[in-house]
Amino acid sequence: MAAAVDTFLFTSESVNEGHPDKLCDQISDAVLDACLAQDPESKVACETCTKTNLVMVFGEITTKADVDYEKIVRQTCRDIGFVSADVGLDADNCKVLVYIEQQSPDIAQGVHGHLSRRPEEIGAGDQGHMFGYASDETPELMPLSHVLATKLGARLTEVRKNGTCPWLRPDGKTQVTVEYYNENGAMVPIRVHTVLISTQHDETVTNDEIAADLKEHVIKPVIPEKYLDEKTIFHLNPSGRFVIGGPHGDAGLTGRKIIIDTYGGWGAHGGGAFSGKDPTKVDRSGAYIARQAAKSIVAAGLARRCIVQISYAIGVPEPLSVFVDTYGTGKIPDKEILKIVKETFDFRPGMIAINLDLLKGGSRYLKTAAYGHFGRDDADFTWETVKPLKWEKPQA
């Protein structure tokens, strides 16, 4: 590629599972999993907040499930690695508060007619608009800046838990700046411009050791060599000290990492968070089906890059609008792609839940609550399954 090519920089960030906001997302989704495992018809809107030595779970839950909320909170904290006050939270000795009420009967009758409606008649749990996005720049059909930031965060946790870097503590953040070329609307990554990692650590390790270990055990296994060059900038724990972390360092809240959960700043976002919400909440199920639609468009070769928007009214099953934009990369006009999308996908919330098997609990939603909801290679991420789209290439 000629040196004179016009390029731009784009940055995405991520946080790993020990970040206080992500801790809250995981607790909220662990509660959702527990409810759905016993009662697939559970209606869950579970929020979590945390600060030093305290976790509070609150919201509206209507379920036949017998759920020990405190036990779920402590187990989730323990699994992440919050096992003593000096790492940011002590799972076994912190205070756990639970304030859970039933779903409002007004909402219940409007959305699912107190369970009397057939799946295709179930209305959206609220108004709102959701987006799905896909780009052919990575095998996952996701933005490279987001994929790399997310994988660095996941790798930080991996080398902490397997003992490769015993000085690591649970909290940490990553950020990746990629230099891109705009090829007629498609995004072509050229190189990684900057890598930033800020990770919590214990008292024993030096900044030089941190930098060396992060380069060797985190960055090298994650970022393909072809994207790194002698000009790539590394900021590794640039503040110089990050011993106090987790809820001890910052308060945490469910739903505060919605860009990390989705596309790293690419595409668009309707503003609704995912974690702690059952599939009647279109903030979640609508965003999942929109991702499947966008990914299927790109996978079919209909476009190199695509965004899909859908919108809903509370209590109404059919979406109010569906929008497709291929940024000028479409092989056929966007309005024809939109027609194919409407014929292929059922955007009614009750049918999304069935077609994507969203009423299954276990650890299904907990897995989504750290390291992104999209671009993951896992059978539980059913919305990542590409649906075949029927179309004919225009004659040359």
UniProtKB/Swiss-Prot annotation:
Name the chain's protein: S-adenosylmethionine synthase 2
Q: Name the gene.
A: SAMS2
- Its EC number is 2.5.1.6
* Cofactor stoichiometry and binding remark: Binds 2 divalent ions per subunit. The metal ions interact primarily with the substrate. Can utilize magnesium, manganese or cobalt (in vitro).
| GO CC aspect terms | cytoplasm
Q: Which UniProt keywords apply?
A: ATP-binding, Cobalt, Cytoplasm, Magnesium, Metal-binding, Nucleotide-binding, One-carbon metabolism, Potassium, Transferase
Residues binding Mg(2+), per UniProt: 13
CDD domains according to UniProt: S-AdoMet_synt
